[in-house]
Amino acid sequence: MSSLLTKTRMLNKILQKSGTEPVAFQDICTLLSEVLECNVYIISKKGKVLGYTFGKDFECEAMKKKVIEDKKFPEDYNKTLLEVNETLSNLPNEGRCVFQEIGKCKKVDKLSTIVPIIGSRERLGTLILARFGNPFTDEDLVIVEYSATIVGMEMLRAMQDEITEDTRKKAVVQLAIGTLSYSELEAVEHIFDELNGNEGLLVASKIADKVGITRSVIVNALRKFESAGVIESRSLGMKGTYIRILNEKLIDELKKIK
């Protein structure tokens, strides 16, 4: 078995990436599974599986279905996980499956370790490890808790990136709307009311007649939105124009104007 220092160095290699490149949760799961010889799962606060690696020769169809197919742990089990506020190590399964609806477990020597993932004093998720017959040592737990800290930092980073991207998308839409004339703005409001979703077919002449504007006003408005990357459009000849919204903030921002 590798020493604590060797294991830590292996984990640190994951972090030796550029400052802008996020650490993949799957990479952490894979490495932990290799160095600790166990199953590893990273679960979000809502129970979504963000990363996982099964240990060598692991056989459990129930677990594989939850993780691989559903990509989500049952709500009742996740609720139990969220009640854990500090590391719980080497929990025996005592012949019971962690999923209540399944009941008995064929393996009677399974040991689980549950580690809360916390960032900025907020519960972000859970790191779960499972091994058969061989308890997790204090040395193992040092590695596991260090890993949970890394995962917490990456979750916070991902959340910040999501907020930044959300802000950027709103700004792009607001700039695009700001380039429209009054009649063009009136046109796009009717266009996206008619669209009834994120994509669809538009007949410009019908909307022009309905609103009382020229067809060129509609065409100019669509061109401005397309050049801003907010929508994409494609002429289908006599059938009309196919429109697809690329920036999901568009509809929300248009609603604010009404």
Curated annotation (Swiss-Prot):
One of its GO terms (molecular function) is DNA binding. Keywords: Cytoplasm, DNA-binding, Repressor, Transcription, Transcription regulation. Residues 204-223 bind DNA. Transmembrane segments: none annotated. The keyword Transcription applies. One of its GO terms (cellular component) is cytoplasm. GO terms for biological process: negative regulation of DNA-templated transcription. DNA-binding global transcriptional regulator which is involved in the adaptive response to starvation and acts by directly or indirectly controlling the expression of numerous genes in response to nutrient availability. During rapid exponential growth, CodY is highly active and represses genes whose products allow adaptation to nutrient depletion. This is Global transcriptional regulator CodY. The gene is codY.
